[in-house]
Regions:
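N-terminal small-domain helix-loop-helix segment of the aminotransferase-like
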Residues: 8-95, 103
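Generic N-terminal amphipathic, Lys/Arg-enriched alpha-helix
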Residues: 1-9
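Short beta-strands and strand-loop turn motifs
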Residues: 3, 31-34, 138-140, 158
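Conserved core of the PLP fold type I
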Residues: 57-158
Length: 158
């Protein structure tokens, strides 16, 4: 029996940013569509990575990230943001926000669920919401300070 893709695979679309990057490369242009970092790696980050490699720290972490990092994030949230969080149940460290958002959507959304999407938004979010068979509801923020009115919130979802 030949291998075939699932029906849900058709719901996953190339992001607009990636499409622009490919088109830019095709015509030999200058890519302004993607936020690719071109700054030097901070010395402490590189040294920390080397120390971890030398110490043999090269295996998968727990599904929710390194315990020490989750606790450091919880401390930062309390000290800097004034928000108490439980690093064991309220903080997850992922390899990136895109993958984390995709996992969260698949874990939390059922077909037909509505998701409030504030404009402007990262285009990939729409593809992820649609892949989870949910329905995006677009809510515009108001210039010049890009705020929203919670009084309008009743009309955001059914």
């Amino acid at each position: 029996m030949p291998l075939s893709l699932s029906k849900k695979s058709s719901l996953i679309a190339q992001s607009e940013i990636r499409a622009m990057t490919l088109e830019c490369a095709r015509v030999g242009g200058i890519n302004l569509a993607q936020g690719v970092c071109d700054t030097e790696l901070p010395l402490p980050v590189g040294q920390g990575a080397k120390e971890a490699i030398d110490a043999g720290i090269n295996s998968y972490t727990r599904y929710d990230g390194l315990k020490e990092l989750r606790y450091a994030i919880a401390n930062k949230m309390k000290d800097y943001n004034g928000i108490d969080t439980d690093p064991e149940s309220e903080i997850i460290v992922s390899a990136g926000s895109t993958g984390a958002f995709y996992c969260a959507c698949l874990a939390l959304l059922n077909p037909g669920d509505e998701v409030i999407l504030f404009e402007p938004y990262y285009g990939y979010l729409i593809n992820t919401i649609l892949a989870a068979e949910a329905v995006p509801t677009y809510v515009g923020l108001k210039a010049p300070d890009w705020t929203l009115s919670m009084r309008r919130g009743k009309g955001w979802v059914n």
